[in-house]
From Swiss-Prot:
GO biological process: succinate metabolic process
CC terms in the record's Gene Ontology section: cytoplasm
Domain of life where this protein originates: Bacteria
Annotated protein name in UniProt: FAD assembly factor SdhE
SUPFAM superfamilies documented for this protein: YgfY-like
Family to which the UniProt record says this protein belongs: Belongs to the SdhE FAD assembly factor family.
Gene3D superfamilies: Flavinator of succinate dehydrogenase
Keyword terms, alphabetized: Chaperone, Cytoplasm
Coarse class of the protein's main subcellular location: cytoplasm
Subcellular location: Cytoplasm
Pfam families the record matches: Sdh5
Function: An FAD assembly protein, which accelerates covalent attachment of the cofactor into other proteins. Plays an essential role in the assembly of succinate dehydrogenase (SDH, respiratory complex II), an enzyme complex that is a component of both the tricarboxylic acid cycle and the electron transport chain, and which couples the oxidation of succinate to fumarate with the reduction of ubiquinone (coenzyme Q) to ubiquinol. Required for flavinylation (covalent attachment of FAD) of the flavoprotein subunit SdhA of SDH and other flavinylated proteins as well.
Length: 109
């Protein structure tokens, strides 16, 4: 929330104050990050879009930094590899990625 004060006498310009505390800024930063991640999760394959979106909706906010880093690694992977890993056609060679893939697959729809 932004606050504006009445214009100073004779100046004609209003004084604008920023957010009242740093918490609002960090919330905005988290919201901006979430929007960017949601865009990166758009893979062009409905199934992958739904799986990644489900993770963002259900787990991202509470996820520890290490898990978030693994999720960001997954977003850098090629779609065809992700598809094979998520559908179980191929084993993911990275143990951390494989564990997160299993967790994402287990999330309720």
């Amino acid at each position: 929330m932004w606050f504006a004060a009445a214009p100073a006498l004779g100046s004609g310009a209003a004084v604008v104050f920023g957010p009242p505390c740093g918490a609002v800024e960090s919330e905005m930063d988290e919201q901006t990050l979430l929007k960017k991640l949601r865009w990166r999760c758009r893979r062009g394959m409905r199934e992958l879009d739904q799986l990644f979106g489900r993770y963002l909706d259900q787990r991202w906010a509470q996820a520890p930094d290490a898990e978030r880093a693994v999720f960001l690694q997954l977003l850098d992977c090629e779609d065809d590899k992700l598809w094979r890993w998520f559908m179980g056609y191929e084993a993911c060679p990275d143990a951390a990625n494989a564990a997160l893939i299993a967790d994402i697959r287990a999330l309720p729809a």
